[in-house]
């Protein structure tokens, strides 16, 4: 029956005591409105068997009168001994011969209508098990996916469930029941299964004894239509599906219409009439016998008050029932009875309410759900768990170390079982505080520990409460202490005589424990202990200090609390105290601070605050007020030791000492601190946060900034004011020599003398007649001497001695006299010299006749520098058969040639392919000779930051120059592409390397003429090389410039003098170097953006220069401005620039600001990029890996020429190789005369020793003979980006064919004082 509405709210909770081991009991719940109408809790033991209690007696006590079971109904292990105990307890008589016979039947389940979980019948020696009113098995909890599990019941003949209508969830397994004839053969399971397509039925070996002569011995009553649970007329199976009309899935037979009619849609398992009140069970929810869609909410909206109010008719949702209260073993979350709180919620076991609370980020403990036995895998997931939502069953063999993950567990919601373990204590549960017992082991135990023979002590020091369930501690033969523990303060459930529900037996004998001195510590009181240590006491006899019982408290760091009898710790910084606060210290551990905010009360701190400093006695004293909150090391106001660590405001004295100041603002620092002859400096000073005062110039009384200028620096002169011109006024200690004192100024103002006066002498006034001495000439007008720039026409001559203008030439007269005297002397010497020469000639002529006749006259040689050494560099001539030019891979183009990607196949290195760049010239014969000269120039130059040339190919279709291929391309594109990954370190490094290469060219007397980032190639992320020597020229030993008046060149990099003089020098290269550095700093931006080529010259003539980049410091920009001085002689040389950028490289962040977040370069990524670029450029024809193989390769082929020389007369040029400090090159990189294999052969790839890389390198031989594997990089220089009409060049010639030029068109390149010639890229 269902609850009548009138009594649905007066459920009684009847406690049930199930006996175990005689005197022990545990509490389950059973709520009844009458003895025949109860709600009961189920079990979850499955087919496991624990203990030896009276199972039949427990089943009767638990389930007699139950109408609904929340959980599983488990009828298991009812064997002969259980039946015997049942008969003895009920005084049932039986023939002694049939003592072991099975029970015929039991009637414990006569009132049962619903099972929320599963029905399990296992090894039950009962001939007939009847459930006369069971209608629904919901299967909310299934056993191995089964809602009905009947297994190994040898003596069971019938399981009768004649009212069963539906099994909502889970399958059916009926196995090894040989005498169960009806349920195995006479039941239509399609009528019972809610979803036959999903739910399965297994009936193996369950009716093999039910056949005789091939016919079933199970006979249904004739009214049952051959479908029944037993042989009686009341055992027929109820049919409510197969007989229904097609329009409905469940129906009932209507007597009024004598037909089957459809049930309400809210019904489950059929119905007895129309409407939701007559359902057998409910499809969704049931409220007081009526099937409904949802349970009424416990809070409803009150339209009058506009808020939620309590609903007196509201219910909790428990399964598919709407109830007034949730069962005690369940929690409550959002008006639903739940077994576990959902994610983001937790249940506080220390409170009396069972509501799931929403977690706060700082308060929610880590909750771990455990449903089954512990395994090695589940243990790993319990790391750091504070609550176990479930149970802990420790049955398998675990090591003590594995179980240490449970040390953080404080609460277990169900139970703990520990069986047959070999550890000595349970310290892995040392923080366990509460066992709730919301579900119990074997329906009774919250804590069960048995058969652990090595267990000596429990060590559950933190256990304070077991809310529900009993404690079982048995057969632990070495376990002491447990019998002395006061369990009444821990176990809430009470048994007989109102004693704790406890079963302790067959552990270590108490007297034997005393003999072994395994007893509680003397500081424990009579409540007992968990072990023998003083921290194992349940309660201390006297004092408790940090969890340990002691006789008395420690005097250091502790305070005695007479109320709680605890030794409480002082504040961590207190050594002794009279209270627990930070201000209750008597003495301190570290530093002592007298806090003025608390009446100068003593406070102990670990370190002094920033406004104080520690004395030798560890007392914190206040810093000087001028230190503000910047910290100090002493009481003074100076910056440094004994004073402030930093100054907010400061004054800097002449001896560079700095003292901190106070001020109301940075603009008033000097005035408020009485420093009239000081000014507020705008420069940063180390240790000063905002600003500081610096002393004015010694010539100024007061000033506003550094300097002596009256107007600009507002300098008030202390001595005199000097006016070199009307717009400039400077304070000085005394007037300079070339000045005069202005009258009526009290000797305080002096002006500069007239410009015709000699500036090394004083003057009387500012007129040309007031000079003490004239600079040029003097004209006397009476007694007045006037200084003039040149003599007047009436006095055309001057006296060289004093510059006086005369009307006669006094110098001519003196010259004539001197010439006569000198002529006479020279004539005498000439006659004597001729006589001596004649005698000498005669002697020489006679001596020659005596020499050997075969002596050949040597031609007269032009004198040269004796230190000049011959150029012994070797030139590699490469046959065209060893080159493959990839015409479809164009890397760049110039006015007279094009650069293609190609492959070099050395003749003597079999199966070797080297990626190269090939520059093909298409010019006439004269230009070819000039290109050959320039290529030879490139070949002899060797430096780390200059691109190396491999060799030449002289073919009919033009001269080809072969160089190393660099996949990373030119620096201009590289800066733009990798801007986000480059910083100050890389930018300054590139400038330094370019300066190093240009310094080498300067020493070799080579003018580059086209230095720019587009003509700088990237070898590696930290290594660049200067290229494009097509414009370079070598200076003769007696010339310092070359003049080019035609050709093509990019004007944005031209020095200002080239526009007018067409003259290239090292100084013009310095100008281009400055522009190149500007490009690097701006990550490849084009200079003079938005300006036409014609306006750049006027822009520079007006004194303008490229602007300071935002990431560039003043010091670095100042170096660029020096490179752009209008006077070439004022520009620094590359030797100076090399040293300056070398200094910049030491601390690049001081000169360039990192505008990007820079990460460390990934060398493997760089190599992969170069490898992919080579594969892409050469269509996979080159395998980069082959260059690291160990295989032997032949030497390079011998050149047709044994030696190539590049003769340059005089100068440092002959010492070309001595200027290279690096050991990466050798003078003769090709061994032309050798055919044997050598380890250091040029361009022979070697096996990479430490780490194999898949990047293709072009090998280059160093000076010391070692082979360098140079990684090749990307796009080449001279790559056209825009049409020629907007290329940024002027005087640009059209590309000519191989048609010979006229003499007027071809001007020769000349040095100074020689005829000017044409060059490919000239102005």
UniProtKB/Swiss-Prot annotation:
According to the record, the segments passing through the membrane are 819-839
Instruction: Outline which residue ranges sit on the Cytoplasmic face.
Output: 840-1323
Q: In which tissues is it expressed?
A: Expressed in vulval precursor cells (at protein level). Expressed in ALA neurons, 2 ventral head neurons, a single neuron in the tail, pharyngeal-intestinal valve and posterior arcade epithelial cells.
Protein kinase domain boundaries: 885-1152
Q: What is its main location?
A: membrane
Lipid bilayer topology: Single-pass type I membrane protein
Renumbered to this chain, the Polar residues biased-composition regions fall at 1265-1289
Query: Has UniProt tagged this entry with the keyword Cell membrane?
Result: yes
Q: What happens when the gene is disrupted?
A: Larval lethality, lack of vulva formation, infertility and lack of male spicule formation. RNAi-mediated knockdown causes sterility, a small decrease in the peak rate of sheath cell contractions and a delay in the onset of ovulatory contractions. Restores normal pharyngeal pumping rate in 30 percent of animals overexpressing lin-3.
Sorted alphabetically, the Gene Ontology BP terms of this entry are: epidermal growth factor receptor signaling pathway; male genitalia development; negative regulation of apoptotic process; nematode larval development; neuron differentiation; ovulation; positive regulation of epithelial cell proliferation; positive regulation of MAPK cascade
Quick one: signal sequence residues?
1-20
Active site: residue positions: 1010
Report disulfide bridges, numbered on this chain. Answer: 220-228, 224-236, 244-251, 248-262, 263-271, 267-279, 282-291, 295-322, 326-337, 341-356, 359-364, 520-529, 524-537, 540-549, 553-567, 570-577, 574-585, 588-604, 608-620, 623-632, 627-644, 647-660, 670-693, 696-703, 700-715, 717-731, 735-750, 753-763, 757-771, 774-787, 791-805
Ranges annotated as biased composition (Acidic residues): 1303-1315
**Segments for region (Disordered):** 1265-1323
Going by the UniProt record, its keywords in alphabetical order are:
ATP-binding, Cell membrane, Developmental protein, Disulfide bond, Glycoprotein, Kinase, Membrane, Nucleotide-binding, Phosphoprotein, Receptor, Signal, Transferase, Transmembrane, Transmembrane helix, Tyrosine-protein kinase
Q: What EC number is given for this enzyme? A: 2.7.10.1
Compositionally biased, Basic and acidic residues: which spans? 1293-1302
Question: Which InterPro entries does its entry note?
Answer: Furin-like_Cys-rich_dom (IPR006211), Furin_repeat (IPR006212), GF_recep_IV (IPR032778), Growth_fac_rcpt_cys_sf (IPR009030), Kinase-like_dom_sf (IPR011009), Prot_kinase_dom (IPR000719), Protein_kinase_ATP_BS (IPR017441), Rcpt_L-dom (IPR000494)
Q: Which enzyme type, at the first EC level?
A: transferase
Q: Any idea where this protein resides?
A: Apical cell membrane; Basolateral cell membrane
The UniProt function text for this chain reads:
Tyrosine-protein kinase receptor which, upon binding ligand lin-3, activates 2 signaling cascades: the let-60/Ras and MAP kinase signaling pathway and the let-60-independent phospholipase C-mediated Ca(2+) signaling pathway. Each pathway regulates distinct functions. By activating let-60/Ras, regulates larval development, induction of vulva cell precursors during vulva development, male spicule formation and posterior development of the epidermis.
Indicate the family of this protein: Belongs to the protein kinase superfamily. Tyr protein kinase family. EGF receptor subfamily.
Q: What is this protein called?
A: Receptor tyrosine-protein kinase let-23
Q: Which organism is it from?
A: Caenorhabditis elegans
Name of the coding gene: let-23
